[in-house]
């Protein structure tokens, strides 16, 4: 991190001390540290259905036109559980009267790309079949969850270097893509090259570091940590296609992107937002003073309230559009 003072919001400072070190080079330790945070589980206000596939929050007074939100947790593609986001997802279900589905996607390196993306697509497809295809549908992700959100929507739209699939699956994916009204990306983790200025300037974090990112990306793409090889470009292009005119032509949905000023991932989120705009897509980007990686959805914080206001307006605007 920089050697001179960087402003951080005082209300968010406790997160830095409370977050276990993100040791992507020692996954058992990283995962155990995360699991320890579940010692005091959240008591939900809404009905929660739990299965091996994920967690679903359903308001008691569910309206016929209530939105469906697929909320994808973070964890560097290698850690995390759907339960980690219970407080956030419960609050989203209450605020928007929405069905919130949090996929329990499989983690790398045991299940590298594209398996986690496929799991998230399956969760969306199952939710649409169960709750109806007419509901305004949004995809929300945080950090690696935002990367998965971007990957799954790109794949559904048939963008970038696609994995092999038959015509029936491609047609099914296009139908699903047409139902997505918007994509919400919080502090997106979408650039495995680690080549941005912010990835160097904030190499020591706080919370997420350049070393952690390097390990996470190798795990995600099935490259051994100690291998003297780079991640194959074809895999990067398949996972995170660069915005182009094809995005607009294929109907990539409106995007709401939030980045942190103090975050090694900051510049890749900015590049994604401007890339979408330059490609002719609808995109907006926000950056709040003093936020850092992992701080956007701290329960009860002013920051999380501000983020919810953004999401509220974005969901309302795009729910009314067909």
What are these regions (language model features)?
Residues 65-75:
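Short beta-strand element of the alpha/beta-hydrolase
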Residues 141, 145, 149:
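Gly/Ala-rich beta-loop-alpha elbow adjacent to hydrolase catalytic centers
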Residues 68, 97-101:
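A fold-wide structural signal in alpha/beta-hydrolase
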Residues 73-78, 262:
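Active-site glycine-rich loops that stabilize anionic/oxyanionic intermediates
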Residues 1-61, 226-229, 319-321:
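A glycine/proline-hinged amphipathic helix-loop "lid/cap" segment
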Residues 53-65, 240-248:
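Short beta-strand-to-loop junctions in surface cap/lid or active-site-entrance loops
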Residues 81-82, 88, 102-136, 299-305:
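Catalytic nucleophile-loop/oxyanion-hole region of alpha/beta-hydrolase
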Residues 26, 33, 37, 135, ...:
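Alpha/beta hydrolase fold serine-hydrolase catalytic domain that processes acyl esters and thioesters
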């Amino acid at each position: 991190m920089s050697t001179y003072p960087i402003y951080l919001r005082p209300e968010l400072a406790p997160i830095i001390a409370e977050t276990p070190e993100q040791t992507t080079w020692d996954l058992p330790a990283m995962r155990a540290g995360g699991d320890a945070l579940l010692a005091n589980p959240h008591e939900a206000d809404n009905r929660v259905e739990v299965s091996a596939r994920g967690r679903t929050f359903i308001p008691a007074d569910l309206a016929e036109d209530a939105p469906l939100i697929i909320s994808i947790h973070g964890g560097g593609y290698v850690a995390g559980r759907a339960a980690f986001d219970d407080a956030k997802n419960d609050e989203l279900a209450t605020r928007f009267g929405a069905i919130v589905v949090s996929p329990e996607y499989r983690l790398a390196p045991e299940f590298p790309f594209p398996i986690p993306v496929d799991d998230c697509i399956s969760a969306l497809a199952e939710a649409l079949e169960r709750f109806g295809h007419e509901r305004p549908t949004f995809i929300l992700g945080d950090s690696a969850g935002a990367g998965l959100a971007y990957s799954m929507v790109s794949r559904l739209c048939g963008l970038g270097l696609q994995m092999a699939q038959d015509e029936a699956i491609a047609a099914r994916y296009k139908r699903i893509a047409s139902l997505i009204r918007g994509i919400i990306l919080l502090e997106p983790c979408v650039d495995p090259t680690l080549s941005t200025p912010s990835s160097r300037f904030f190499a020591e974090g706080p919370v997420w570091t350049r070393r952690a990112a390097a390990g996470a990306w190798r795990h995600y793409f099935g490259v051994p940590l100690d291998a003297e090889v780079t991640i194959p470009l074809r895999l990067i292009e398949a996972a995170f296609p660069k915005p182009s005119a094809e995005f607009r032509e294929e109907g990539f949905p409106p995007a709401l992107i939030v980045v942190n000023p103090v975050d090694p991932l900051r510049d890749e989120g900015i590049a994604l937002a401007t890339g979408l705009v330059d490609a002719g897509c609808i995109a907006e980007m926000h950056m709040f003073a003093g936020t850092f990686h992992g701080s956007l959805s701290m329960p009860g914080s002013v920051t999380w309230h501000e983020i919810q206001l953004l999401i509220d307006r974005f969901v309302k605007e795009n729910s009314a559009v067909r």
